[in-house]
Amino acid sequence: MRIILLGAPGAGKGTQASYICKTLNIPQISTGDMLRAAVQAQTPVGIEAKKVMDAGKLVSDEIILALVKERLASQDCINGCLFDGFPRTIAQAESLKNDSILLDYVMEIHVDDKEIIERMSGRRVHLSSGRTYHVRFNPPKKEGLDDLTGEPLVQREDDQEETVKKRLQIYHDQTAPLLQYYHDWSLTGSPDAPRYSSIKGTGSVEEIRQRILDALNS
């Protein structure tokens, strides 16, 4: 089964992606990982990509698509794969379609922006140990202090409210057209159209996981 899993920062996509891959025995593949692996292995596509990157240019969709084809030919993709961060644009989605790279499912884990902002902006971290807290969902015993050392907790820059809002806006700008594209395609009844679902991303990890499994098995 080939799956595209989409979700805003803080929607819990990473947790669910790991579970899907383990359950279906498929690899999670990203364009970044594919690029690094191809460059390191000095494949023809990797050599071409390295020339482009060394020149300070963006890797073209043509090269990205060649990497995807190369990766899908690997033995561990025989049962399918889960795409992480690809496609990012309608042009890339169209390229997949035109090259007859079939997809089984496109799924978005949907969480309202307000909920994501609360999730992320409430995080606090004890830097030296990596212990994490949340001001609402998992507060420390003493406000602002690590439970074990009593040292101050910090809010990472990525978790500051304005930063979260900017990241969400970028996600919506990039992904909304892509979601609409796959949603509309799924309704055409075309035999090569993937199924499409928007999964409610609130509740426990197990509840969200069950919604995903129910959708995949429907």
UniProtKB/Swiss-Prot annotation:
EC number(s) reported in the record: 2.7.4.3
Entry GO CC: cytoplasm
Catalysed transformations (reactions): AMP + ATP = 2 ADP
BP terms from Gene Ontology: AMP salvage
Binding site for AMP: T31, R36, K57, L58, V59, G85, F86, P87, R88, Q92, R156, R167
Renumbered residue ranges of the record's region NMP: 30-59
CDD domains named among the record's database cross-references: ADK (cd01428)
Region (LID): 122-159
Location (main, coarse): cytoplasm
Pathway of action: Purine metabolism; AMP biosynthesis via salvage pathway; AMP from ADP: step 1/1
Compartment(s) where it occurs, according to its Swiss-Prot or TrEMBL record: Cytoplasm
Top-rank taxon: Bacteria
Keyword ATP-binding: yes
Binding site for ATP: G10, A11, G12, K13, G14, T15, R123, T132, Y133, G203
Keywords: ATP-binding, Cytoplasm, Kinase, Nucleotide biosynthesis, Nucleotide-binding, Transferase
InterPro entries linked: Adenyl_kin_sub (IPR006259), Adenylat/UMP-CMP_kin (IPR000850), Adenylat_kinase_CS (IPR033690), Adenylate_kinase_lid-dom (IPR007862), P-loop_NTPase (IPR027417)
Molecular functions (GO terms): adenylate kinase activity; ATP binding
Summary of subunit composition and partner proteins: Monomer.
Family according to the record: Belongs to the adenylate kinase family.
Domains: entry comment: Consists of three domains, a large central CORE domain and two small peripheral domains, NMPbind and LID, which undergo movements during catalysis. The LID domain closes over the site of phosphoryl transfer upon ATP binding. Assembling and dissambling the active center during each catalytic cycle provides an effective means to prevent ATP hydrolysis.
Protein purpose: Catalyzes the reversible transfer of the terminal phosphate group between ATP and AMP. Plays an important role in cellular energy homeostasis and in adenine nucleotide metabolism.
Name listed for the protein in its UniProt record: Adenylate kinase
Organism: Chlorobium phaeobacteroides (strain DSM 266 / SMG 266 / 2430)
Organism classification: Bacteria, Pseudomonadati, Chlorobiota, Chlorobiia, Chlorobiales
